[in-house]
Amino acid sequence: MSKKDNVMKEQNIQTVSIRQTIVQGGVKVFTYLFLLVMALIILFPFYWMIISSLKDLAEYKLSVPTFWPTKVHWSNYAEAFTTANLGTLFLNTAYVGIVSTLLSLVITVLSAFAFARLEFKGKDTMFGLLLATMMIPGELFTITNYMTINQLGWMHTFTALIVPFLVSVFYIYLLRQNFMQIPNELYLAAKVDGTSDLKYLWKVMIPLALPTLISITILKMMGAWNSYIWPKLVANDDAHQMITNGLRNAFTDTSGQANYPVQMAAVAIVSAPLFLVFLFLRKYIMSGVSRSGIKG
């Protein structure tokens, strides 16, 4: 091969390399622009909620909206807390969330352990039927659950908010998949040493599956915090109102006029705990879900 051919070959390689660099750079720029646009679309409603909560009602109703309040009204937050009785709503929601989460964890752990380690007739068939129920929309159970709660006399009680949602097939499946990753040899060795199933579950499996359990706890608490339809149906009295239902009716006067800035302030207060939980514990959520999806 002549020197001229070598030079042309090097030039072609350089040209291809430059083109690849340009294409890769263009892809990166497009990717970052796309992510930036998506981030703005997602974050803008939260930004609008915050600035709206700092305005007065007259400025909020301006035909040309302002993107920052001319005068900051921090008093909206104090008014929101007292008007909506947020203290009681927080306590009610926390009580339902904590109790339902603890009971749900007990049921989920025992069920997942049974399907992952114990051997009994019809185990796979039963687990398959449970998974099949995940394809049924939860809304279909609303009427039957309501009738059952009414017949049991649980209307307007915390029991009606807790019991119907103690069992989650998705959480059982999630934890069972995590338990399946733990070598069965550990279980057999423990049985040889005379360890009971409950002791093995408590000493070995639960510590190893802790990230998934934390994920389930967070998701369950968030579900209780955001619940609206069911509490509205079965426990909408003042003594048992959840935080989402309390906000719905707290800021409308006798003329039907809603004080939107104060309502936005209340929504910001209610959203803050969930935002902080996700901000500081998101790694546990992702870790628990990813660990449960490795082995089927």
Show the residue positions of the predicted features.
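A structural signal for multi-pass alpha-helical bundles of membrane permease subunits
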Residues: 19-23, 27-296
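Short, Lys/Arg-rich, polar N-terminal cytosolic tail immediately upstream
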Residues: 1-22
